[in-house]
């Protein structure tokens, strides 16, 4: 669950700052699942929620979006919450509490027959309480022949993890989707093309989200592609990267054309930043294509 605080003036620490506060569903994997549903895809969300008011609201929301899920609420566990501060220029700072998701395990996976791909947010890997169980889940997904896609997580979170460990995680995946600062940090390079080349030696397909500059990718034979972004005023950038990821996954699985996948990802991200929150508008579900 996301609690978004839209800051309307300069922040006065230890005092009052004018703001608009809203509550809405969030979480990287859940955001990607709802945007996939927006694009007409059959999405199943693997997560854990607590038996609380936030869990009730999220299950209702997933049902409205058409996102399949286990339907289980776990007693004596609290649903994860992220407090998001949104600056006057639309940029955000997040304070996450993963709650029940810290206990994710292979027992939370559905039967894997019929699934083509799995997107995994890096946050459960970064979280030491869920890491071992999530690595076991990845093992199970790989054994089932499912294409694996990762968004590794923010620089702030990844700074706690040794680089070699991050590289070992990335080597488990077929596609890595991350933003430019994350790509530069993980690769320990100062230039984007050098970062792409380094990361492509670990993960076969690497896609870098560049915000208003668009996106870039590298694939077999070190072919690098840039996709510009159409300009639009940003109301709230929360979830824009997740919306891009969903658009990319949807088109890439359909066509295996990275250029068109980057374009659909950018279109989806642009739609996201024109409203508050990380989810697509409910009235548009299944109408994104």
Predicted regions and their residues:
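Ribokinase/PfkB-type carbohydrate-kinase core domain
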Residues: 60-74, 87-224
């Amino acid at each position: 669950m996301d609690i978004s605080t839209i800051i309307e003036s300069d922040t006065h620490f230890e005092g009052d700052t004018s703001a608009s506060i809203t509550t809405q569903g969030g979480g990287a994997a859940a955001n990607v699942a709802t945007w996939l549903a927006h694009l007409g895809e059959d999405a199943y969300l693997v997560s854990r929620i607590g038996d609380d008011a936030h869990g009730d609201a999220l299950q209702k929301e997933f049902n409205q979006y058409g996102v399949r899920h286990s339907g289980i609420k776990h007693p004596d566990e609290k649903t994860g919450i992220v407090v998001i501060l949104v600056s006057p220029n639309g940029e955000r700072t997040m304070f996450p509490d993963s709650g029940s998701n810290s206990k994710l395990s292979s027992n939370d996976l559905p039967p894997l027959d019929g699934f083509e791909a799995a997107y995994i947010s890096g946050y459960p890997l970064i979280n030491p309480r869920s890491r071992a169980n999530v690595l076991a889940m990845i093992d199970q997904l790989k054994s089932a022949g499912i294409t694996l896609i990762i968004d590794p997580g923010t620089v702030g979170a990844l700074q706690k993890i040794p680089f070699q460990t991050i590289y070992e995680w990335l080597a488990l995946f077929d596609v890595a989707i991350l933003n430019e600062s994350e790509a530069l940090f993980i690769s320990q390079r100062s230039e984007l093309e050098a970062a792409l080349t380094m990361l492509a030696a670990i993960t076969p397909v690497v896609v870098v989200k560049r915000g208003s500059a668009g996106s870039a990718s590298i694939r077999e034979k070190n072919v690098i592609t840039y996709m510009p972004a159409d300009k639009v005023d940003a109301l709230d950038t929360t979830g824009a990267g997740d919306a891009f990821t969903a658009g990319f996954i949807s088109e890439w699985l359909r066509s295996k054309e990275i250029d068109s996948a980057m374009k659909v990802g950018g279109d989806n991200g642009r739609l996201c930043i024109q409203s508050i929150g990380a989810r697509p508008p409910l009235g548009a579900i299944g109408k994104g294509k």
